[in-house]
């Protein structure tokens, strides 16, 4: 990504050991990384996720073993590609699909906030992607299928799965859209993907909505135009039934299939981890499952159509260690920010600056509760039990200006611990909770020093807030129920972002906050 402070960053990663070469942990990409799509190029795999109202859009991952994933960039890094003006947590960029054909990578998706379906392409996935190629066929969750010089697009306008042929570099429709399948009768048939195997065209879709009734169904045909015959064993994957009703994983669906060089088949899907009752906060995450797909037969996912947190499978590549997403950062202009950092909507980049020893945020009157462009940069909560700590200095500020750390689901639901400038020029530590029209100030403490540490910890049922003047001895200053920030309570399609922010109390004020560090790790 050009000129953004989102290029490579030397993360300090913690690695946990898998039990053996045939064991791995789900989710393979934890946190708010939903709607995975995957393709293979030679021995490497590429994967993308949806991003909704966050920027840059569509994270791009690479793996050699299907278990350990390295983020190598984003597909949408410019406002000319993705305009997120006014987007909320149920808008913006929906499910993408990634495909590779004759030396070119294609990513197709939907901007539900404006423009509809489009694709971008590149010869170098680690570099810049093209400007959008806009497409005529509507619906959401578009996908591409290439065969013998033809490019087909599938999506779900009018509550069904529709197919058309397109010219991918121009977006021109070459053959008109036609309905090819309605699904099995479940709500919201969506997320279609086409594959060809043993002379059949297989059509994989999701039904039931992206919640507890989510499921994968499949149909096949000898002709790409149909008619498609449903798998008599549908659904091929779901946790909605009695078998998985007490599972730690729910909402399995929206999947994509890929074959490995050894001939084995694999599936990536989204699912979520309820952590207190039926409430989840880490968003819909990316999971991996083995697939048995015999000649002329239907695919079988993990033997019984379900997945587990601890998986046993014959992985195509030996895996000795599995990444555990732990980060320790000392902000510096010598090390540009890593790809895990995201902004709300299209950021005003002049408000973000890496100095010799800090990430400097310049606030505006756009607050965390605004549909505008607040000064906000964060990374996903990826573990149910975690600890996140930052040190900051609200160096320049007017009365009422604030900077701090937010546990952010969306503009209607977030918990914040922050510094607020008072009339005497000193700072007050403030812990406050925002839940729709409810605003509760839980704590206000006058501070002595100017560079405190702020900390938030998460568990299944509570977020706890702490501060320290010296970085060694921390005092608890707030506790809040996790359920009120959950997707089930707050709504939307995202997950918790742990965000650094700075905002002003008056239009004329331009406060500056220097954040010196950010540390995040799971707590076992």
Residue ranges and their predicted role:
Residues 4-13:
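Sec-dependent N-terminal signal peptides
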Residues 20-524:
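Carbohydrate-active catalytic/glycan-binding domains of CAZyme proteins
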Residues 13-19:
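C-terminal segment of classical bacterial N-terminal signal peptides
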């Amino acid at each position: 990504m050009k000129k953004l402070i989102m290029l490579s960053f030397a993360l300090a990663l913690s690695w946990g050991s898998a039990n053996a070469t045939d064991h791995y942990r789900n989710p393979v990409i934890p946190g708010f990384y939903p709607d995975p799509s995957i393709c293979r190029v030679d021995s490497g795999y590429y994967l993308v996720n949806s991003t909704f109202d966050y920027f840059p859009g569509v994270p791009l991952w690479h793996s050699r073993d299907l278990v350990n994933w390295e983020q190598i960039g984003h597909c949408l890094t410019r406002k000319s590609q993705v305009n997120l003006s006014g987007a909320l947590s149920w808008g913006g960029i929906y499910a993408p699909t990634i495909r590779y054909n004759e030396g070119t990578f294609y990513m197709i998706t939907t901007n539900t906030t404006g423009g509809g379906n489009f694709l971008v392409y590149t010869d170098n996935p680690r570099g810049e992607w093209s400007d959008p190629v806009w497409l005529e066929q509507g619906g959401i969750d578009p996908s591409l299928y290439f065969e013998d010089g033809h490019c087909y697009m599938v999506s779900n306008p009018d509550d069904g799965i529709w197919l058309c042929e397109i010219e991918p570099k121009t977006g021109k429709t070459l053959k008109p859209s036609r309905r090819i399948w309605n699904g099995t009768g479940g709500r919201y048939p969506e997320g279609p993907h086409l594959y060809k195997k043993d002379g059949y065209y297989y059509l994989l879709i999701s039904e039931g909505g992206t919640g507890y009734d989510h499921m994968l169904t499949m149909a096949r045909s000898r002709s790409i135009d149909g008619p498609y015959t449903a798998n008599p064993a549908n659904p091929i994957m779901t946790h909605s039934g009695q078998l998985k009703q007490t599972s730690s994983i729910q909402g399995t669906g929206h999947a994509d299939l890929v074959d490995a060089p050894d001939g084995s088949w694999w599936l990536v899907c989204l699912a979520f981890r309820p952590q207190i009752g039926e409430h989840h906060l880490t968003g819909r995450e990316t999971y991996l499952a083995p697939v048995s797909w015999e000649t002329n037969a239907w695919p079988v996912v993990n033997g019984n159509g379900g997945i587990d947190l601890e998986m046993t499978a014959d992985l195509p590549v030996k895996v000795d260690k599995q990444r555990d997403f732990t980060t320790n950062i000392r902000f510096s202009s010598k090390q540009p920010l890593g790809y895990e950092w995201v902004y709300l909507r299209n950021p005003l980049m002049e408000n973000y600056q890496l100095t010799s020893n800090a990430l400097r945020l310049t606030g505006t009157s756009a607050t965390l509760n605004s549909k505008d462009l607040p000064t906000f940069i964060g990374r996903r909560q990826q573990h149910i039990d975690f600890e996140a700590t930052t040190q900051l200095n609200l160096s320049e500020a007017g009365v009422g200006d604030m900077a701090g750390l937010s546990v952010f689901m969306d503009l209607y639901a977030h918990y914040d611990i922050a510094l607020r400038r008072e009339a005497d020029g000193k700072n007050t530590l403030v812990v406050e909770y925002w839940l729709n029209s409810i605003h509760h100030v839980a704590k206000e403490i006058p501070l002595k020093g100017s560079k405190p540490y702020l900390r938030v910890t998460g568990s299944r049922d509570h977020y706890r807030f702490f501060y320290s003047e010296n970085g060694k001895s921390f005092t608890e200053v707030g506790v809040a129920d996790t359920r009120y920030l959950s997707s089930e309570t707050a709504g939307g399609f995202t997950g918790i972002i742990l965000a650094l922010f700075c905002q002003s109390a008056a239009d004329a004020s331009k406060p500056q906050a220097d954040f010196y560090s950010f540390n995040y790790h799971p707590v076992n």
